[in-house]
Amino acid sequence: MKDAILITGGTGKIGSRLVEHFHAAGRTVVFTSRSDANIEKTIAGREGLHGVKVDFRSGSAAETVVAGLDRLGLEVAALVNNARDLAALGVDEDGTVPDANWLAEYRIDVVLPYRLTLALAKKGTLRKVVNVSSMYGMNAFNPHLYEGPFRPPLQYACAKAALIHLTKCLAVQLAPQKIAVNCVTYGGVEGRVDEEFKKRYAALCPMERMMTDGETVGAVDFLLSDRAAYVTGQNIVVDGGWGIW
């Protein structure tokens, strides 16, 4: 198969939505997870859906993914760099980010997308790359959104900002190979927060609400389609207007 879509972090909140969307659209989808159980649960015996187990905290993670694709006999036409490591978000009680968490966040948000994109580009079938960033890669944390001591995970924001710039650099580097590289920057998605947080978020967002799970799909679908054939190096912001005021 030469038209598979690879979605890293395919069993998380956004990744699982993307996996289900593209599989329902008839695409061959391969996703990554650290858990065999999550892979089996997601596939659930369905054809055209494949999982590769990998721990992206490993220095050889990109090679592990490529080896997994080779075992499955799949060639990737589109890559969505979506993997996350929630453990890297930790901040000390005094608000200081430990060095280990700076490095872990940059590894999964910058180094991994870079290495995996280049590894797949060498295969010759890759045509589309979408990196997944965050509104905090473009905007500083707003202390009015949070209760209690304000200890923002700056490592996350800085790494996501770097990913946006990496998108532009790779778009230039890979253009001669006819590979388009773009980014989607999301605002806050419902599901991991309580009602009080949602109210505070709504008061700070022009559209007065958080994103729904289903709204995470549209921009990625566009960028991986023929409608975006002449689009590269761009960052599509899907944040309900969070960053415009």
Residue ranges of predicted features:
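Short C-terminal tail/terminal secondary-structure segment
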Residues: 141, 221, 232-245
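Substrate-binding pocket helix/loop in short-chain dehydrogenase/reductase
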Residues: 90-106, 143-144, 152, 201
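Conserved NAD(P)H cofactor-binding loop of Rossmann-fold oxidoreductase domains
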Residues: 82-90, 241
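Conserved glycine-rich Rossmann-like NAD(P)H-binding loop of the short-chain dehydrogenase/reductase
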Residues: 25-40
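Catalytic Tyr-X3-Lys loop
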Residues: 95-115, 130, 156-158, 163
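Short, small/polar-rich loop/turn modules that mediate ligand/substrate recognition or access, typified
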Residues: 175, 180, 231-233
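Conserved glycine-rich cofactor-binding loop
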Residues: 11-12
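Catalytic loop of short-chain dehydrogenase/reductase
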Residues: 85, 130-162, 167-175
